[in-house]
Curated annotation (Swiss-Prot):
Keyword Isomerase: no
Organism the protein comes from: Escherichia coli O1:K1 / APEC
Coiled coil: none
Signal peptide (from-to): none
Keywords, ordered alphabetically: Chaperone, Cytoplasm, RNA-binding
Basic residues: compositionally biased ranges: 137-146
Gene Ontology MF annotations: RNA strand annealing activity; RNA strand-exchange activity
Family: Belongs to the ProQ family.
UniProt biased composition (Basic and acidic residues): 117-136, 147-177
Gene transcribed to yield this protein: proQ
Disordered: annotated segments: 105-182
Protein name: RNA chaperone ProQ
The keyword Chaperone is annotated on this UniProt entry: yes
GO cellular component: cytosol
GO BP terms, alphabetized: post-transcriptional regulation of gene expression
Amino acid sequence: MENQPKLNSSKEVIAFLAERFPHCFSAEGEARPLKIGIFQDLVDRVAGEMNLSKTQLRSALRLYTSSWRYLYGVKPGATRVDLDGNPCGELDEQHVEHARKQLEEAKARVQAQRAEQQAKKREAAAAAGEKEDAPRRERKPRPTTPRRKEGAERKPRSQKPVEKAPKTVKAPREEQHTPVSDISALTVGQALKVKAGQNAMDATVLEITKDGVRVQLNSGMSLIVRAEHLVF
């Protein structure tokens, strides 16, 4: 009997589960809330397949249920599903609130990491600028010109060319954006931009919710944004 290939990471296990149970797991896009106690169902159904251990299944489930796309799917009115996609009851308010807090904390951690990275880049740029200014070349002494002998004719001084004033370079015009005043006028699939500080990132409308607009960035990340951060 040939040895079955072994899955080495939680992402590989999730991809296997999405292929094995397509009505329950998904490899991309919004995920459906899972049935409570689905871990034991997985152990019973995939025991021995792909040399999977309980530890690997538990780690993969933890990664899957803590992902942003899964937390987005845990919302009021959503229904839990079993391995075959059969409904297993609606989510209760406590689980929805817990998922919302997890999502907010995850977003806050990402923003803090980005701010820290930007601060380090600014510090590195400032340090590099100081190093460039520090070593200055020593000025060499000007060579002494011999004195003109008495009676020798003076050579006419050459006129220096008139230096032209440097042309002023116009600063590039800032790109003007129109703020979104009414999110109800937006449509799914519509292209717009998300303001992030002084920059605006391209995005596509995925869903209009009571808390704002869920958009997907070009990087593939999706998030809910309030109207004041959206522009055309």
